Structures are given as structure tokens and as C-alpha cells.
A protein has these predicted regions:
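A residue-level marker of the well-folded mature domains of exported/periplasmic proteins
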Residues: 23-278
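C-terminal motif of bacterial Sec signal peptides marking the signal peptidase cleavage site
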Residues: 18-22
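Bacterial N-terminal signal peptides that target proteins for export
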Residues: 1-10
């Protein structure tokens, strides 16, 4: 089961290239002798690649949410061209004032398009968007915006509903375990859609949730999975950024429907499907 993560990085980058290098006709009182120099400078700026920064909440592992975003970054370079954009990224940026510091440094380094890939970056990005109107900001899963800041997400809840249906048909214990990070809108949407899907095929289903309060914490994910298995869950899923739940399901002989990436590499027997952000 695959879903399309519409980062629109390539399109956004190209749009920004033209928007940010557009010439302003105001103040055209420069001396005629200086006009050739100004024209040359404008041409040079127009030919420079757009600098794009990506801020990641977790490391780029073999699988997971951050890995899928980085695949999108590399895809943008391939499709737009290295002569048009250059990218940089910072991993393991917490959803604290550190995010503002990292993004501000990216701006100081000349990045004109910033992708903030985690919900908790929202307020910091909105603040910086107001400070730097000539920089474009793309924020994942949030709801605040500015003239130069927009949001992006996918209709992942549709896939969650289908995954719930599959889990509801596969379980023998009628207990499904769900490892979740934070009770934010995106995560709650996923839990609700998954539960509705499961109950549509098996009204007796119980969906039990364990909160980790972390996007990336493999030991917590493992412990949470073990807790849910101990409570009778024979099918697991997760909204966190690790493969630990899939690994725990594999080790316990249970079933798993991973989120973000295909995790058959760590759960070849346990994985019955995967929601892949593609």
C-alpha cells in the first residue's frame, strides 16, 4: 500500500527561482554608466542555483519519515537539476528553540526555500517568515501560515482507514496496538481513521494506544510495542519515526502494518502491508 507524499519540492523550487530573481523596476534612477554592471549582476544572480534547506526532526535512517523526506530532497535535485538548486539538511533538530536557531542559520547561509518537516517547527517558522519576507517556507502537517509560508501534507488518513480494515480482518485476538508520538491533529486523524477502518470489518475490535511523547526513540517504541503485545495485541502499527515497532512484532511472532516506509527488511514475516510515503 503506497501513498504519495506531495512535497512539491521541485515545483516550489522552480517557482521560487523565478519569484526570487524577478527584477524590480522601482528606483531606476541609476546612472547610465552603471547600467551594464547592474545588468550583469542581475544575470549572475539569475544563473545561481536556488539554495534549499531541509530541517529534519530525526536522523536519516534506512527507513522512516525522515528517510522518505530525504528521498524527496534527492528526487527534487534529480528532476530540477543541480544547476538549478542546491540543498542542505540538518538532522535531529528538536522541536524547540533549536529549530529557530538552525533555520536562522540556514537563512544566513543563503537558503531561500526552507522545508520544516515536523509539526513542532510551526511557530518558529511563522516567526521567521515574518522576519524574512524574501524567504519561502514550507511546513509539514501544520496549520499556521504567512504570505511566504504554506503547509503541506497528504491525505494519509485514507490509507490509515484501509490499513485499519486490513488489521481488522487479520487479527485473531480482536486487539490492535497503536504506538503514537504526540496527540496532535495529524496523529489523532490517523488513529481515528485506522480505528474506523478496523471496526468497519470487525465491530468487536479494540484499538489500544500507547503514547511515547517522541518522534524518534527506538527503545521507547520497542517498550511500547511489548506493552501492547502484553495487552493482547496481535497486530501493531505506529506513527513514530523508527522501525522498532516492526522489529518487536517480528521478534514476538505478531503482525505489523508499518507507517512511513516499507519495513520488510526488519519484519519479513510480520509485515502484512505498509503505508509508504512515496
Amino acid at each position: 500500500m503506497r501513498m504519495s507524499l506531495k512535497l512539491v519540492a521541485a515545483a516550489a523550487a522552480l517557482a521560487s527561482v523565478f519569484a526570487l530573481t524577478a527584477c524590480d523596476d522601482k528606483g531606476s534612477t541609476a546612472k547610465k554608466a552603471e547600467e551594464p554592471k547592474a545588468a550583469a549582476e542581475t544575470k549572475t544572480a539569475a544563473n545561481e542555483p536556488l539554495k534549499v534547506g531541509f530541517v529534519y526532526v530525526a536522523p536519516i535512517a534506512d527507513v522512516g519519515y525522515t528517510k522518505q523526506h530525504d528521498i524527496g530532497r534527492l528526487y527534487a535535485i534529480d528532476k530540477v537539476g543541480k544547476d538549478k538548486i542546491t540543498t542542505t539538511f540538518v538532522e535531529n533538530v528538536p522541536e524547540t528553540a533549536d529549530a529557530e536557531r538552525v533555520i536562522r542559520q540556514m537563512i544566513n547561509d543563503g537558503n531561500k526555500l526552507i522545508f520544516g518537516t515536523s509539526f513542532g517547527y510551526m511557530n518558529y517558522m511563522q516567526k521567521l517568515a515574518k522576519e524574512y519576507p524574501d524567504v519561502k517556507f514550507e511546513h509539514a502537517t501544520g496549520y499556521k501560515s504567512a504570505p511566504n509560508m504554506t503547509n503541506y501534507n497528504i491525505r494519509f488518513y485514507e490509507g490509515r482507514y484501509l490499513a485499519g480494515m486490513l488489521a481488522g480482518g487479520a487479527t485473531k485476538s480482536n486487539v490492535i496496538g497503536y504506538v503514537a508520538p504526540f496527540p496532535i491533529p495529524e496523529v489523532l486523524q490517523g488513529i481515528n481513521a485506522f480505528t474506523l477502518g478496523a471496526k468497519s470489518v470487525n465491530p468487536k475490535i479494540q484499538v489500544k494506544v500507547v503514547w511515547t511523547n517522541a518522534w524518534y526513540d527506538p527503545p521507547k517504541d520497542t517498550d511500547s510495542a511489548k506493552t501492547l503485545i502484553g495487552q493482547g495485541a496481535d497486530v501493531l502499527t505506529q506513527h513514530t519515526n523508527t522501525s522498532a515497532v516492526a522489529s518487536a512484532a517480528e521478534a514476538a511472532g505478531k503482525m505489523v502494518i508499518p507507517y512511513n516506509s516499507d519495513m520488510k527488511s526488519v519484519a519479513p514475516n510480520a509485515q502484512i502491508a505498509a503505508l509508504v510515503l512515496n
